[in-house]
């Protein structure tokens, strides 16, 4: 089998380059800046419900397509595999990678918090009542409930409610069922492939309004919380962003180098998705486009279909960093000394409470409450200290989660021998808009 890769639009792109104002990431970046200005100078306009609806509406438009895209991608990936062992092998390798990297992210948060001590000498006011709702939800998050929640009551309900893990479970079972039918399932496989292409077409239409969503989300955030919300806790925000930067550039950078690619070229390749996530504070808003780009990058459809959706529940690197860093910040702000043993307990508990958090509203804050409730309940009132700035840190959590899952997919594909090196080189090295890059594979 040989793969012939052709970048059919490379020449056209070079000679007829898009005007800069028509490039998506330029539009999104401009919308974010405009949103900050509107929210800062005219907060009453910024926090208007209609402005908020712009951001919420865009995220909902993306989310409406996530479940069918994941279902079709996973089913198609598994159904086209002739070897059952291969699916299990990919899943095991993905989970091993997730646990190792997640542990590193949690440990990095602990180390940075101990070295920089952003909560030491904190002077501020907290309102314990403000976090009562989050703490209540966290108390209901038990391991057995999480496992049972993966199994849907009905298949229709899983799709209707957008429960990613439930859809993923059904897709895996359905894919194996089609695999067992062999050639008799050819028509169904073709239908699933066609639906997947149609859904990606829907996303390509929806993503054109990303600048509107980014503007609305940013204008509302600044208008609602105000720039002064950043002032009092700038130390924690700066520490969190610094830690996430180190994790992506150094941690993921080393992993990427081992797998044979540059983290900087990879980040440039997914710049559109990063800006969409920055504007919406939701890593799920870029999931469909991310899956499509990873296939263009050379990852096999089966690896992309299994690793990326699973990573949104088991590989939340940004959330992991946030939980250990915020826990120590709260302890320092409340003058509570945590022993080494207690910090190791926090790491282990956070590893468990973070699983499946992506499907929960206010996931980072709720999992933080779950971790504190399990380790040091007396720290729960201190969550009110970070409540006001949690929104400003959610962007960084989402960006880090997206980067982590993208790198994870490429690494697992490389580990499994399912990474097309030539496609990887073409996609990362050519000065071509990735969305314009057509990759044709000819089997001979």
Curated annotation (Swiss-Prot):
It is found in: Cell inner membrane. Responsible for the transport of dicarboxylates such as succinate, fumarate, and malate from the periplasm across the membrane. SUPFAM superfamilies: Proton glutamate symport protein. Pfam families: SDF. This is C4-dicarboxylate transport protein 2. The gene is dctA2. PANTHER family: AEROBIC C4-DICARBOXYLATE TRANSPORT PROTEIN, PROTON/GLUTAMATE-ASPARTATE SYMPORTER. The lineage of its organism: Bacteria, Pseudomonadati, Pseudomonadota, Alphaproteobacteria, Hyphomicrobiales. GO terms for cellular component: plasma membrane. It comes from Bradyrhizobium diazoefficiens (strain JCM 10833 / BCRC 13528 / IAM 13628 / NBRC 14792 / USDA 110). One of its GO terms (molecular function) is succinate transmembrane transporter activity. It is a multi-pass membrane protein. It comes from the Bacteria.
């Amino acid at each position: 089998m040989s793969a012939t890769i052709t970048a059919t639009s490379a020449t056209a792109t070079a000679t007829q380059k898009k005007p800069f104002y028509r490039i998506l990431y330029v539009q999104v970046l401009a919308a974010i800046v405009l949103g900050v200005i509107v929210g800062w100078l005219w907060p009453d306009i910024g926090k208007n419900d209609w402005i908020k609806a712009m951001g919420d509406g865009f995220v909902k438009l993306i989310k409406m397509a996530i479940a069918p895209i994941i279902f079709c991608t996973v089913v198609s990936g598994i159904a086209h595999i002739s070897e059952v062992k291969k699916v299990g092998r990919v899943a095991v390798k993905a989970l091993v990678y997730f646990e190792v990297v997640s542990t590193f992210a949690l440990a990095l948060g602990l180390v940075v918090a101990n070295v920089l001590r952003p909560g030491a000498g904190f002077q501020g006011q907290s309102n314990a009542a403000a976090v009562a709702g989050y703490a209540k939800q966290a108390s209901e998050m038990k391991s057995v409930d999480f496992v049972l929640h993966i199994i849907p009551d009905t298949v229709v309900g899983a799709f209707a409610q957008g429960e990613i893990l439930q859809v993923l479970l059904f897709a895996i079972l359905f894919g194996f069922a089609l695999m067992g039918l062999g050639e008799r399932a050819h028509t169904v496989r073709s239908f699933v492939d066609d639906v997947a292409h149609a859904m990606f077409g829907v996303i390509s239409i929806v993503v054109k309004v990303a600048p509107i969503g980014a503007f609305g989300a940013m204008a509302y955030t600044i208008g609602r919380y105000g720039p002064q919300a950043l002032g009092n806790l700038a130390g924690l925000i700066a520490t969190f962003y610094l830690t996430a930067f180190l994790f992506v550039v150094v941690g993921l950078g080393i992993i990427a180098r081992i797998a044979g690619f540059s983290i900087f070229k990879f980040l440039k390749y997914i710049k559109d998705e990063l800006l969409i996530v920055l504007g919406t504070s939701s890593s799920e808003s870029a999931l469909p486009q991310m899956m499509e780009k990873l296939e263009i990058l050379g990852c096999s459809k089966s690896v992309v279909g299994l690793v990326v959706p699973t990573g949104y529940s088991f590989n939340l690197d940004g959330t992991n960093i946030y939980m250990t860093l915020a826990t120590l910040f709260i302890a320092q702000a409340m003058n509570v000394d945590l022993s080494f043993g207690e910090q190791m307990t926090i790491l282990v508990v956070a590893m468990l409470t973070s699983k499946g958090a992506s499907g929960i509203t206010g996931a980072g804050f709720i999992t933080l409450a779950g971790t504190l409730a399990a380790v040091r309940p007396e720290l729960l009132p201190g969550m009110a200290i970070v409540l006001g700035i949690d929104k400003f840190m959610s962007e960084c959590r989402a960006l880090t989660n997206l980067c982590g899952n993208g790198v994870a997919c490429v690494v697992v594909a490389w580990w499994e021998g399912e990474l097309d090196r030539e496609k990887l080189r073409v996609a990362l090295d050519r000065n071509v808009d990735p969305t314009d890059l057509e990759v044709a594979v000819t089997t001979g």
